[in-house]
A protein has these predicted regions:
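N-terminal secretory signal peptides that target proteins for export/translocation
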Residues: 1-21
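Sec-dependent signal peptide recognition
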Residues: 23-28
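C-terminal motif of bacterial Sec signal peptides marking the signal peptidase cleavage site
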Residues: 34-37
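Beta-sheet-rich non-transmembrane sensory/scaffold domains
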Residues: 39-729
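Residue-level signal for mature regions of secreted extracellular proteins and peptides
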Residues: 31-32, 338
């Protein structure tokens, strides 16, 4: 698997792990189950109940969500647990998983940001690259135009962020280090949000606790003559608790940064977004049900199916529902309470998965001293998340996904259900559900970019094959699907039927041409206004241009074939320029992946897209920051010029054993696009570190933790171990 990019290698390695801590671009255990909407509050702060309105009518299709009457949740869960027992499963999460969306793909947003009130106006700047303007995503480096907040690892090769630091920009463009705080060792943070006019940071991540159980809960009912030994038949600790962590940090100007309070929500983190001062966190909770599925102990016989089913009758709502806790800074104990009541959860009766999982949407007011919050939940899992400034869309599957022979396989013909929630501050309202053919793929960093809201319609690009591979060499020789990709347009019906109706699909009878060639996978998808751009790849890189101006009659208007592929498509320059940047990999005509490829496309003529220029950096095995997630690029629009910075690890040295290349240096590679002349220009590279020995590059800090931001005429490169390199552009 040496030719695979690191995100794909990690995905393969983790497909059989049901309870691993969520990591960037990782795979975690998820059951794909029934979905619904719930309300609830939290202890230790001001709870805002979701608004009470007219109850939705009974669903008219299996996709829609139905309200749960008292006792219905418990009955539903007991039914699912009995199904698991009948199937011979040994844990609630066995046999089902999905990708956590801890990271989603990157797209440029306007670089000019309004500075905090009461502070001297800093220059315009480019911070985290986002999918939607006005919808912030967590990242390890943020700036308000005057200060830089960074989260860093302690040593090269580490995978855990251990320090939060602040640096202040000086008049000459240099950085002055402020104070830093150590992050709790038991928490694994993914990134931070900046809110409340720069006065508060919200760090988001997870806390996973392991234990070696010493007692079998059903041992006394198995056999009175069984040995009482406590030796385990399995040598590995068991996950006993997974919680999403929200650490609120004071970041007022002129004060040292310091932790303010911490919230814990049962379940692992799917992803988070911030709109204005409201943090939205999506989490997913897999109850353990230890009485039903005890860890086997040496000397104790495994419980029979009848004994397991008897334990199911003793399951109660507190065993099902997640909790939330808040601990103010300096407090000795946290206040804990259920996140929701059982009657707050809704069900999707037609869901075929047997696993039990609750997914929660929690809104937190970061500007509120008491951290007022509200929650909605649904019974089921999530394998895709997209958020506009007004709505949150959660994509799910009603069928399980399994790993087999290095491939990921959807059972039967894959379909994706999409549930829409309206959001406005603390208000979270279920709006409706729809279903589309295909699925969002297996790469968690890209699933959100396969959805886009435009004029209240949701456009979705799905992948039609029931199996996927991680790299060209694993690609099957043939694929039955006629079109690798399907475009669907969904519209809320506006009535009482809580539906997202499919108003158009492509290909269709009128326009049957496939999107992609047989055997290809969907790599990059980018929606821009009334257009969509889709990249598929197996041996060459077809770029398709879709005209969505008439949502009832979408069409493919243009196609461009080049060597290699683009993992990400990023608009550059003014919209009128019609320019797009592609970042991915070069490849041979046989599909063998080579170095990092950066391409400038002219898509101003939808019928005739052109590749104006391209650069290939390094040999096979070279990586860019975008191989590790959506935030591995920084774009700054200055008039008709776009300044581009991408961390890269460049392989140029042939191994002493021959046959492959090893890392030569790690750096920030820079380009500039002139939208008037439509040119791509190289800028001097900021070298972070060079590798003297053959294996030194493999021991260096991961590109996953390298970033850059631009402020005025300066660029700041966060490199190895949290060290900044400041330079004029």
């Amino acid at each position: 698997m040496s030719h695979l990019n690191p995100r794909h290698r990690l995905a393969i390695e983790r497909t059989t792990q049901c309870h691993t801590p969520a990591v960037r671009y990782g795979v975690v255990a998820v059951a794909l189950l029934a979905l619904g909407a719930c309300g609830g509050g939290a202890g230790g702060g001001t709870t805002v109940s979701p608004p009470v309105g007219v109850e939705p009518p009974s669903p008219i299709s299996p996709v829609a969500l139905a309200a749960s009457e008292p006792g219905a949740l418990l009955s539903y869960v007991q039914k699912k647990l009995n199904q698991q027992i009948d199937q011979g499963l040994t844990s609630n999460s066995e046999g089902a998983f999905a990708f956590t969306g801890a990271l989603l793909s990157a797209v440029a947003t306007p670089a000019g940001v309004t500075p905090s009130s009461g502070v001297a106006s800093p220059p315009n700047f480019a911070s985290t690259t986002l999918q939607e303007g006005g919808v912030d995503e967590s990242d390890i480096l943020k700036t308000d135009g005057s200060r830089l907040f960074s989260m860093t690892v302690a040593r090269p090769g580490d995978q855990q962020l251990t320090k939060l630091a602040v640096h202040t920009r000086q008049a000459d463009g240099s950085l002055q280090a402020g104070n830093s705080i150590a992050l709790p060792s038991e928490d694994r943070f993914n990134g931070l949000h900046l809110a409340a006019n720069g006065e508060r940071l919200a760090l988001v991540g997870q806390n996973v606790k392991y234990a070696v159980p010493l007692v079998n809960p059903l041992a006394s009912s198995v056999s009175s003559t069984t040995s009482s030994t406590t030796a385990l038949t399995t040598p590995f600790p068991t996950v006993v608790q997974t919680q999403t962590v929200i650490n609120i940090v004071n970041s007022k100007v002129g004060q040292p940064i310091g932790s303010n309070s911490t919230l814990h929500i049962d379940g692992y983190l799917i992803d988070s977004r911030t709109i204005d001062n409201t943090l939205y966190v999506v989490t997913s909770w897999l109850p353990r049900f230890d009485d039903v599925f005890p860890v086997p102990l040496a000397g104790n016989a495994s419980p029979t199916a009848a004994q397991r089913k008897e334990a199911v009758t003793r399951v109660t709502n507190p065993k099902i529902l997640p909790t939330v806790s808040i601990k103010p800074d300096g407090a000795s104990q946290a206040s804990i309470q259920p996140l929701m009541a059982d009657t707050d959860c809704q069900l999707q009766a037609a869901n075929a998965s047997s696993a039990v999982q609750l997914t929660t949407i929690t809104a937190v007011n970061l500007a509120s001293p008491s951290l007022e919050r509200s929650s909605r939940c649904f019974l089921g899992g999530v394998n895709g998340l997209y958020m506009s400034t007004k709505n949150l869309y959660l994509a799910t599957s009603r069928t399980d996904v399994v790993a087999k022979g290095g491939s990921l396989i959807y059972g039967g013909e894959p379909t994706t259900d999409i549930h829409k929630f309206g959001v406005s501050g603390m208000t979270i309202n279920y709006r409706g559900s729809g279903s589309v053919s295909g699925h969002l793929g297996w790469d968690a960093s890209k699933t959100s970019y396969r959805m886009s809201e435009h004029n209240n319609d949701l456009r979705v690009v799905t992948y039609t094959s029931s199996f996927g591979w991680f790299g060209v060499l694993e690609a099957p020789s043939s694929v039955a699907a006629k079109s690798p990709a399907i475009l669907s347009v969904l519209r809320e019906d506006g009535g009482a039927t809580v539906q997202l109706k499919t108003i158009a699909v492509l290909p269709n009878q009128k326009r049957p041409a496939p999107i992609g060639l047989s055997g290809e996978q969907v790599y990059a998808v980018r929606f821009l206004g009334a257009r969509a751009y889709v990249v598929t790849f197996r041996r060459i890189d077809p770029l398709y241009v879709l005209d969505l101006a008439d949502p009832l009659d979408p069409k493919v208007t243009g196609e461009l074939k080049t060597n290699g592929y683009s993992d990400y498509l990023l608009p550059v320059g003014p919209d009128s320029a019609g320019l797009m940047l592609g970042v991915g990999k070069d490849a041979t005509t046989e599909g063998r992946v080579l170095g990092v490829k950066v391409s400038l496309f002219d898509v101003s003529n939808a019928a005739a897209p052109k590749e104006l220029a391209s650069r290939v950096i390094g040999k096979a095995g070279s990586l860019s920051g975008l191989d590790f997630g959506r935030h591995g690029v920084n774009l700054f629009n200055v008039g008709n010029t776009t300044r581009i910075a991408i961390p890269m690890r460049v392989n140029e040295t042939l191994s002493t054993s021959g046959g492959f290349y090893v890392p030569s240096y790690q750096s920030l590679v820079r380009f500039e696009v002139d939208a008037v002349n439509k040119t791509l220009t190289d800028k001097p590279t900021l070298v972070g570190q060079t590798f003297a020995s053959e294996f030194a590059g493999y021991l260096a800090s991961s590109l996953e933790f390298e970033r850059s931001v631009q402020i005025g005429e300066n660029i700041y490169y966060l490199g190895s171990q949290g060290r900044f390199t400041a330079s004029g552009w």
